[in-house]
């Protein structure tokens, strides 16, 4: 089973704005990354997975 970053965020009951703030990036930047226009940095994905207690192995990027 693979999870997208969006699925993880929704599972955490966080808005895009809240997740962007958690990562220390702008909301627009986060939206671009979540929609696939830009790529997430590895450390951003790692931080999201840590917050959600999800293994990096099951994240679909």
Regions inferred by a protein language model and the residue ranges of each:
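Short hydrophobic/aromatic patches at helix-to-coil boundaries
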Residues: 2, 58-61
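Short basic helix-loop element that most often maps to the first helix and adjoining turn
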Residues: 3-22
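Key DNA-contacting residues within the recognition helix of helix-turn-helix
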Residues: 6, 31-32, 60
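A broad helix-preferring feature
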Residues: 9, 23-25, 40-45
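Short coil turns linking two alpha-helices in DNA-binding domains
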Residues: 15, 26-29, 55
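Acidic-residue sensor for enzyme active/binding pockets
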Residues: 16, 34, 44
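Recognition helix of helix-turn-helix/homeodomain-like DNA-binding domains
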Residues: 25-39
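DNA major-groove recognition helix of helix-turn-helix/homeodomain DNA-binding modules
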Residues: 41-58
């Amino acid at each position: 089973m693979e999870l997208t970053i969006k699925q993880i965020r929704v599972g955490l009951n966080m808005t895009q704005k809240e997740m962007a703030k958690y990562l220390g990036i702008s909301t627009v930047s986060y939206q671009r990354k979540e929609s696939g226009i830009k790529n997430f940095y590895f450390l951003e994905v790692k931080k999201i997975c840590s917050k959600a207690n999800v293994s990096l192995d099951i994240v679909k990027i």
